[in-house]
Structure formats: structure tokens, C-alpha cells
Amino acid sequence: MGQRPFSPNHRSGVLNATTAGAVQFNVLGPLELNLRGTKLPLGTPKQRAVLAMLLLSRNQVVAADALVQAIWEKSPPARARRTVHTYICNLRRTLSDAGVDSRNILVSEPPGYRLLIGDRQQCDLDRFVAAKESGLRASAKGYFSEAIRYLDSALQNWRGPVLGDLRSFMFVQMFSRALTGDELLVHTKLAEAAIACGRADVVIPKLERLVAMHPYRESLWKQLMLGYYVNEYQSAAIDAYHRLKSTLAEELGVEPAPTIRALYHKILRQLPMDDLVGRVTRGRVDLRGGNGAKVEELTESDKDLLPIGLA
């Protein structure tokens, strides 16, 4: 079914910045609904799952039947639609009890319901995506210190596994797998940018933890090998390769990717990595100010200002 673009004037009027705009929705961790820093009670797991479904499709209509299928999957009770409506009423009451006009946020619209979020700063997922995209653009242009600022900001939105309190629901598992890939991409590009800025020593400990958690993610192993090598730990870089090779052989019966094998042979021959390690071109961000101002180059003292929360 086609869906109309969201307009803050749709149905219930303009969102009130002092009420609806103060509500924060968080999915990068346990589901949270905060009002000015106070967590609001969200009820039973099924009721929270209804809110999660609406939040993942924010500003779009979610059919009542889709909510029923997501919550009960193949075994919905006879009164499932009415139960969903009860959950919606309970969530509206929670908002109203907190002093928020729920009609500005959670509206009924055939064939179901719509969760209105007028400002993407209200949702941690939207903040993550915006910062991730800015960081990837900066990295592609060689603005690695700027990329670090954005990518680090993106990761600051994560509090734990996606919707970690609702992992028993299939729709959450599917969404979590997809979003975890985005999170690991940000970690990988952050490590790449840090190595380019001469901060391999900072990212190595975090990369070790990440490869332990995601042993088949070869892009993380690549950055770990590079980090060790450019930091003059050739033996550690070689050891990282052999750990990856053993893991893949024993558990999947495959070899590392050709790019990883090529990197390994370059390390063995002690060749320069200029083609693999990015170079800072320009556009360092002054991290001591608010939005930051670009200057010509990254100095040694500036490197200590890089906000890499990876140690």
C-alpha cells in the first residue's frame, strides 16, 4: 500500500516543541521512551513491541494486521486487533499522564496507526544514521579527522544490542541483524580513519574486542592487521592473520578473502602500506569548539584531541 509522506501538520496539527518535541525514542539498546530525561513505563513486552514496530516505521502508517502478525506471528488470538488497540490506548495514556498530548504523537489512521516524530533528533536511530552518513562522506573525501568526529558521534547513540529487551520477537531479530551490520561498518571506518590519523594504538584494543565478538568479519581483521603493522608490531599483525585463517578454516572451511591474503604477504615482505592506509588531506575539525572550524592540517598535538572512544 502506498504511504503518504509525513507532514508535521498531518491530522493532529503541528508538534508542540515544548511537549511532543521533548519526547525521545531509543531503539539502539533496550526500548526507551524518555521525556526530558525521565524514562516512561512502557508496559508488557507485547505492548512495547507494538511501540517498537511503530517506531521502526516512524511517520508511516503501520496496518493493524501488520502489528498483529509482528506480535503473535503465526498464532494470533481471536481478539488480537482489539488487544493491539488496547496497547495503543495504554501508550497514549502513558504519554498523557506525563503531560504530553498523545494526539500529536500516536494517531489512528486507516488501516492502522502512525507514530509521528517531527525532529530526527528525537530518535537515536535517526541520529546514528545521520552521523554515520556524514562520517562516511568525510572519510571518502580524505577528511579523516572530521570522519572520526562524526563516526564516533554515531556510535555514542548505542547503549547495547538493538531492542535488547525484545529479542524474542522475530521482527526485532531481523532488524537487529541488519543494523548490526551498519554498526560494524562504522567501527571499521572509524578504525580506518584513526589509523590514517596516526592513532592505530588507540583503536587496536577495541578492534581486538570486536574481532572476538564478530570473528568472521574480515574487514575488522584487516584494520587490526593494518593497525598492528603501521604501529610497528609486525609479529602481532602476522598473528592476527593466522588467528583469522584458523577460525575460518575450522568453523567455515574457507580461506581468508584475497584482499586479506594480499595484505598478509605485504606484511611478510615489510612493504609500505600507502595504498591501504588513507592520508589526511585537509579539513581537520577543531574539536574544542561546537561545530568546529576547518584548518589546514593535522598536527601531532592535535591527534590527542581526536574523540575516539575506543580505548
Swiss-Prot record:
PROSITE patterns: OMPR_PHOB. Residues 15-117 bind DNA. The keyword Lyase does not apply. GO terms for biological process: phosphorelay signal transduction system; regulation of DNA-templated transcription. The keyword DNA-binding applies. Pfam families: BTAD, Trans_reg_C. GO terms for molecular function: DNA binding. InterPro entries: AfsR-DnrI-RedD_regulator, BTAD, OmpR/PhoB-type_DNA-bd, Sig_transdc_resp-reg_C-effctor, TPR-like_helical_dom_sf, WH-like_DNA-bd_sf. Keywords: Activator, DNA-binding, Transcription, Transcription regulation. Transmembrane segments: none annotated. Identification of single-nucleotide polymorphisms (SNPs) between the attenuated M.bovis BCG Pasteur strain and the virulent M.bovis strain AF2122/97 revealed a E159G mutation in BCG_3145. The E159G SNP was found to be present in all BCG strains, but absent from virulent M.bovis and Mycobacterium tuberculosis strains. The SNP in BCG_3145 was found to have a subtle effect on the activity of MoaR1, suggesting that this mutation is not a key event in the virulence attenuation of BCG. Acts as a positive transcriptional regulator of the molybdopterin biosynthesis moa1 locus, promoting the expression of the moaA1B1C1D1 genes. Belongs to the AfsR/DnrI/RedD regulatory family. This is Transcriptional regulatory protein MoaR1.
